[in-house]
Amino acid sequence: MDKFNKLTGVAAPLPIINVDTDMIIPKQFLKTIKRTGLGKNLFDEMRYDDNGNEIPDFVLNKPAYRNAQILVTGENFGCGSSREHAPWALLDFGIRCVIAPSFADIFYNNCFQNGILPIVLPQEEVDKLMDDAERGSNAIITVDLEAQEIRGPDGGVIKFDVDPFRKHCMLNGLDGVGLTLQKEAEIATFEKKLEETQPWL
């Protein structure tokens, strides 16, 4: 998992509440177990018409937001099924941070496990960032995880909270496997001792 320290990039506004995981990545794209290649189908039913042509009015199809790395959106983002393909699709598109008033619990946890920083803010602060994001290619926002600050294009600073353990994992690029490997020496010692004391196992 890539480390997340400080991210400066374009923020895309998606002022929709209750965006579920089927909207993020529809079920027909869940056959793969690869984490790559799903970005092209992110928000598929909102990005493309029935003929597969881009819908120009959808935010991520607009030139200013095609390379967005931050998504500012509505409450209860990521509700619905627990498919891990949802954060995979966001990450493959290039989204490393999602800011919303609230998230579905499973999606929220899956984001941290896949290197995406989900930030919960009060509605009024999300509204402010949404207004900033409407500036298009001028909507450059900096998310500083170490300082737990978001800096808007006007220089304003918004503080955010994050669990210390999750923060440590994001700063150091540690998912479940990475955390386990940190204890590789201790695990090897334990297994050797177990083999010596209980050879019948």
Swiss-Prot record:
The keyword Amino-acid biosynthesis applies. One of its GO terms (cellular component) is 3-isopropylmalate dehydratase complex. It comes from the Bacteria. Pathway: Amino-acid biosynthesis; L-leucine biosynthesis; L-leucine from 3-methyl-2-oxobutanoate: step 2/4. Its EC number is 4.2.1.33. Gene3D superfamilies: Aconitase, domain 4 (3.20.19.10). GO terms for biological process: L-leucine biosynthetic process. Pfam families: Aconitase_C (PF00694). CDD domains: IPMI_Swivel (cd01577). Keywords: Amino-acid biosynthesis, Branched-chain amino acid biosynthesis, Leucine biosynthesis, Lyase. Transmembrane segments: none annotated. InterPro entries: 3-IsopropMal_deHydase_ssu, Aconitase/3IPM_dehydase_swvl, AconitaseA/IPMdHydase_ssu_swvl, IPMI_Swivel, LeuD. One of its GO terms (molecular function) is 3-isopropylmalate dehydratase activity. Belongs to the LeuD family. LeuD type 1 subfamily. HAMAP family: LeuD_type1 (MF_01031). Heterodimer of LeuC and LeuD. Catalyzes the isomerization between 2-isopropylmalate and 3-isopropylmalate, via the formation of 2-isopropylmaleate. This is 3-isopropylmalate dehydratase small subunit. It comes from Parvibaculum lavamentivorans (strain DS-1 / DSM 13023 / NCIMB 13966).
